[in-house]
Each structure stands twice: as C-alpha cells, then as structure tokens.
Amino acid sequence: MTQINSSSVIPPQLAIDPDDGIIKAWQEGTDAKYVTSYKELKNHSLDLPVAIRSMASRKAVRECEATGRDFYYIDTGYIGNRQKRKIYHRVVKNGMQHSNFADVPDDRWRTYVESTPGLQYLTFPGWKKDGGPILLVTPSDKPCKFYGINRQEWLDTTIATIKKHTRRPIIIRDKGLRRERIGNGSIYNQLDDDNIFAVVTYNSIAATEAIGYGVPAFVSAPNIADMLCEKDLTKIETPLYSDTSLVEKWQHWVAYCQYTTNEMATGTAYRLIEKYNLS
C-alpha cells in the first residue's frame, strides 16, 4: 500500500457550506476554515484554496477560475457506487473531472476489486465488439447549466449525427432518480441486457463505467475517460479500442482520484492528491 506521511502539515485552506456532510469530512481532514458562500471568498487571500461540492456550486467554481484561486471540487465518485449509499467521492483539483492522467501504483485498484464485496465486476474483461444498439446517455440539468448547453438541442443533434453514420438502433437512457440507477437499474445491467455496442454521452460517468466494462464510449465534453473515448461521432462504427494495458493503468489512476469520507476526514485524500499531483 502506498505510504502517506500522515503527520505532514496541510496548508491553510477554506471550505464552502458548513451544513454539507461531505464537505465536513474534507474540512475535518484539512482543518479548513468555513465560509458560507462563494461571495465571502473576496475577503480571503487568493493563496487559500477552497473546497466546493457539486455542480450546483458553479458560481463558486467560476469565481475561482476568474480570480486564479485553487479549488478542490467534490462530487460523486467514478466507480463503485452501485449500492444505495455512495461510498466514493471524487475530489478534483481545479476541475470538474480529472483530466491529467498519472501513472500510479495499482494498490488502491486491487483493494477495490479484491477486498470490496460486490466490486469484482470492475475488472476489465477486454473489449466487447459484437454488440448491437447504441446507448445514448443524456445529460442531467446540472451539467447542462454548468456548461451552458441546451439538453434537447444536444440530444437532437447527437441523434441526427449518429443516424447519418450507422443503422444501429439507438436506446436513450435518461439519468432519472438515483434509486432507479442502482441495483438492477444500473448501467452495467443495461449494457448486458441490451447487448450495447457503444455508449454515447455528453460527459457522464457512464463513459467511465462503460469503458471499464469493455464497451467503447463517445463523449462531447471533458471527463476522466477522455483518453480512452472517441469524440468524433462520424466514427460511431469504428470506436476506439485502446490496449488492455492502457485501460488497466487508467483504472489504477481512477482509483487514486476518488475517496471515502474517512479518507477525507483523515487527510489521506488531500495528501494523495498532492503527492501524485492529481488533477
């Protein structure tokens, strides 16, 4: 297991929203000073980074981007949250999803797959190339508002482009309520049940889940699976099938980019981010 110096001093920082339970875990691990709103950031030095949670905090993110303040963005983890209660949360330095691949050890990944009951399905099975339909996963309101897109326009344009370049049927999967997306309603079940050939999405975590399950993906906006996804929908019949060794190294990196609340509360998450320059 990667050794982390738990006694190293964490520099001063800020955290928005003392009422948020996940932010509270990060605050406990970093001893961050709470502020109640992004509007209060102007009262603090730009040298102080700030922890922010969820795309609903887009004004805080935009404020940091405009002023050059570092921020730690916290949201749903990429993998392993198939159960009712989310276990893993991504923490991204100066971004919404991780984009700078890092070659890291495989220890966290092995812990996920070998030691966590019910996560054995995460092992990359190799590419599945004999599927039928295209699964189109639509964006929810939050990313649409954050990136300034019109959901229906994106959907119409995407469907039209796909239909120009393939005769495969298109199945649309809307995000819906969380309880509808876990257990039997998980995307993994649908990939199998509908024998999906490829997944198309805006920047949903569905791309990450599909790639790890051996189904290629196409994306429109930055996400952690970028390096393994095709962006050009005119190539819908010829998806990107990266080497297995690269997919596995990517999975090791994904495991280093998400954390439990306990890892946040002990400062382990922060120290891993800084040690491996994860962003």
What does each model-found stretch correspond to?
Residues 1-49, 54, 142-143, 272-279:
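N-terminal pre-catalytic "stem/leader" segment of glycosyltransferase-like enzymes
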Residues 6, 74-78, 131-143, 173-176, ...:
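Short loop/turn segments at strand-loop or loop-helix junctions that form parts
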Residues 12-16, 137-138, 142, 150-189:
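Catalytic donor nucleotide-activated moiety binding site of glycosyltransferases and closely related
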Residues 34, 70-72, 78, 170, ...:
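Hydrophobic beta-strand scaffold residues
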Residues 37-66, 70-74, 196-203:
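Short, well-ordered secondary-structure micro-motifs within conserved domains or adaptor modules
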Residues 37-43, 163-218, 222-224:
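Donor nucleotide-activated moiety binding/catalytic core segment of transferases
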Residues 83-131, 227-279:
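Leloir-type glycosyltransferase catalytic cores
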